[in-house]
Amino acid sequence: MEQLDVFLLGERVGVLESDRGKLTFHYLPEYLRRADAAAISYSLPLQSEPFDPVVTSVFFDNLLPPDVVRKRLGKILHLSRRNIFGFLEAIGGDCAGAIALYPPGCTKTADASAPTFRELSDEEASQILMDLPKRPLNIGKEEGFRISGAGAQDKLIACVKEERIVLPLYGAPSTHIIKPPVAAYRDSVFNEFFCMRLAQKMGLPVPECGILTLKDVPYYCVTRFDRQNKDGRISRLHQEDFCQLLSVDPEKKYESEGGPAIPQCFQLIKKMRLGAAGQIDFLRRIIFNVLIGNGDAHAKNFSVLYRGKTIRLAPVYDLLCTEIYDSLAHETAMSIGGETSFAGITRGRLSKMAQECKVRPELILSLLDEMLEKITVASNNLADELNRQHPSTVYAEICRIIERQAAWLAVE
């Protein structure tokens, strides 16, 4: 029997056990007795009994990179891609939210009062970023660097201080996600930056993001919303994506593969009591993704953020206009009133989606019209602004997609 201690917000709360690959999780009795005890997941509520292997595996699997990345990581770490326990043992020191995993008795964890960091030279940072395709997440190269992150795109999860990249070591919390250009998708860095900035202009909650340039190569850099900085001291905030909340296998994140649909996500928001503001926020995100042509808004790209007993939708992330790339499917990740083709999404489809969510169609249409009034002008103004700072033809392409979608959705 192998074991890993599970930490939440720096506190040891439970144990993950592997019996020949079969995973179970249980909370510590002394933790359950605490008045302030909190569950590590909506899908793993506080209880004394161990959780069965299925629900345990799904939650912890969702903390790891997808299979396509794990195949490359496995060659470095000598692990098979389905060895969830092995990967968590190797890279689970800093996960999404406030979860961290360590071998029992491990003493090389971050001292919260004096975490360990190593600043990189521009040359080192540039080399690490260029090497990400063959060394995902920079794993296996730096002692004490145990960081996990979901998502298929190559990324470095680290810290950025005064435009210098810093590696957090031995469990110190990371604060930024840095993404290099994706060769297959032209100007992907500027695409994501534009979509995130546009979301902000449309009133959606957006973490601080920007372009970091190293050796004349632009990188998309975003501040982690599950971290907070108080007087220079970094601490973790807990978060869960909708696959974790609904106990859905991460490889089934798309609705077409059996993953969550919009009505299912909406009902979850109701059950978690995020209130009318949370429901409207979610619907506005759905509309925005349709208008920018984002076909990758699947369940793992929506999360909730915990602050004490307060739960709200996490800021938006991983926004990209996929419609400008001919090699990608021209479909939404979650159907809109039964329609997945961007060309087939109409006001009627949005009304049907509202009915499926048990919401008045008038509400979704009013939210749509509110966004239609602003988004075309806002996107063109943003394109002009960004072209002065980071020139790219991709802005005009995204604006054309937005104009097309807006024209289709303005018609009754």
List the model feature ranges, each with a label:
Residues 1-299, 303-412:
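Phosphate/dinucleotide-binding and metal-coordinating scaffold of catalytic cores
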